[in-house]
């Protein structure tokens, strides 16, 4: 505890951001597997199950587009905490009787989860850039590499966690457990994250979401189609 207390404020903030991101990523991966397995058990066709994730991806793309704008306007602490809160709501929406879980209802819950995921991811990665001092690009790349690399590993762990929770608990029980744990993470985040983290001094305009560089805008559009193709294949 003494060693933790001796850390700089920036390192402490990085640990809070990383902890938030890890907790969220675990629940996100688990939720994906839980939805696939549970609705397969209910007799949903493969196409119907795929449709459940349609809004998740679409609303994630939209959030990705405007996330930086929101982060600069509101502060990255707020966008991260909003993302955590929305994920809790999405999980609680799915903790209802089975007869309520229609395709449209689950798609709406998944849309909220998609928004939450990209708010959380954007906030985590942007927060690191805000916490690293100017001229320390090596440290920035190292921290981002840890965060990004851990995402893929933890999402895989989340898949196994989802299957385990469905085996040990019911679908509803798994949703309630994850919502409860994430609520605790959210409450600590509200307390621990700086209120001015990543907040721009000058309010950006909405048009600032597009880069002034034509090359970057083209690259962004290409990535949109790339990830769209990946999700269709997956």
Describe the role of every protein-language-model region.
Residues 1-11, 191-229:
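Juxtamembrane intracellular "pre-TM" segments in multi-pass secondary transporters
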Residues 6-58, 217-234:
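Helix-loop boundary and gating motifs at the non-cytosolic
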Residues 22, 90, 102-120:
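Hydrophobic core of transmembrane alpha-helices in multi-pass small-molecule transporters
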Residues 57-65, 155-156:
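Residue-level signature of mid-helix packing/kink "hotspots" within the transmembrane helices
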Residues 63-76, 166:
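Helix-to-loop junctions at the C-terminal end of transmembrane segments
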Residues 85-100:
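C-terminal ends and interior cores of transmembrane alpha-helices
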Residues 109-151:
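Cytoplasmic helix-loop-helix junction between adjacent transmembrane helices
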Residues 173-191:
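Symmetry-related core transmembrane helices of the 12-TM Major Facilitator Superfamily/SLC fold
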